[in-house]
């Protein structure tokens, strides 16, 4: 199981939000590329980056920071946030991003996502971000009437690399990952699932790793790392054993 340390970008700074609320941002640094290298030094080979400004605006607002991260980080960068057209997808892949996460466009234009998945083999991840079990879009500001499982089924056999499941109500709060909902989603689909939202420590990593055989491909963690509650090297080692 892959452990993805997270770098969320707002105004060029490294931040974490509480429940996706841009007004509840905690700043953890002003040098995203340097933070990426700290994660690399701890053994990270995979990195999850989110352009928060882009998620709300629908276009990249932290391009310079993302470019610096991709240039410096020696591993695999997964990027999401406001990527909603083919030009943006192609641009990021050409820059060196390994995987693109698409959320809002996946709900509103699933054919676009399927087209991108065909064009960029193993390169597209669909974000299934949920508030109380319903898909949320536009930087989590809008909640739909589409259940998580229904959203996932739209992309069965479409060539999507993975599903990224986030329980918004836990994100950035250190309440613990919603393991039951994550595992249930993995059981309902043939696509690998990446867990996100609320990771508070090594126990979450351990329990998720026990379900790797059921399709849990990875887990994203941010605040627990920045606040010293989770040792990244230990988490990576635990994930590697699953």
From Swiss-Prot:
EC number: 5.3.1.16
GO cellular component terms attached to this protein's record: cytoplasm
Keyword set includes Cytoplasm: yes
GO molecular function: 1-(5-phosphoribosyl)-5-[(5-phosphoribosylamino)methylideneamino]imidazole-4-carboxamide isomerase activity
Keywords: Amino-acid biosynthesis, Cytoplasm, Histidine biosynthesis, Isomerase
InterPro entries xrefs: Aldolase_TIM, His_biosynth, HisA_bact_arch, Isoase_HisA-like, Isoase_HisA-like_bact, RibuloseP-bd_barrel
EC primary class: isomerase
HAMAP family per record: HisA (MF_01014)
Protein name (record): 1-(5-phosphoribosyl)-5-[(5-phosphoribosylamino)methylideneamino] imidazole-4-carboxamide isomerase
Gene that produces this protein: hisA
């Amino acid at each position: 199981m892959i452990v993805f340390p997270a770098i969320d970008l707002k105004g060029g700074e490294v931040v974490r939000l509480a429940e996706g609320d841009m007004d509840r941002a905690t700043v953890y640094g002003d040098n995203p590329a340097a933070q990426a290298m700290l994660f690399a030094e701890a053994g990270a080979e995979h990195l999850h980056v989110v352009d928060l400004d882009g998620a709300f605006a629908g276009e990249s607002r932290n391009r310079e920071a993302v470019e610096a991260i991709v240039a410096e980080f020696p591993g695999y960068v997964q990027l999401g946030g406001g990527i909603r057209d083919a030009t943006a997808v192609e641009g990021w892949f050409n820059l060196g991003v390994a995987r693109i996460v698409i959320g809002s466009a996946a709900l509103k234009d699933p054919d676009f996502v399927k087209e991108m998945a065909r064009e960029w083999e193993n390169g597209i991840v669909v974000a299934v971000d949920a508030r109380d079990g319903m898909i949320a879009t536009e930087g989590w500001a809008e909640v739909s009437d589409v259940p998580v499982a229904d959203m996932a089924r739209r992309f069965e056999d479409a060539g999507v690399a993975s599903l990224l499941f986030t329980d918004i109500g836990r994100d950035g709060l250190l309440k613990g990952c919603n393991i039951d909902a994550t595992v249930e989603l993995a059981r309902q689909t043939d696509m690998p699932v990446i867990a996100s939202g609320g990771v508070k420590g090594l126990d979450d990593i351990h329990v998720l790793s026990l379900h790797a055989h059921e399709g849990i491909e990875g887990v994203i963690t941010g605040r627990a790392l920045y606040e010293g509650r989770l040792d990244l090297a230990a988490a990576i080692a635990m994930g590697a054993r699953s």
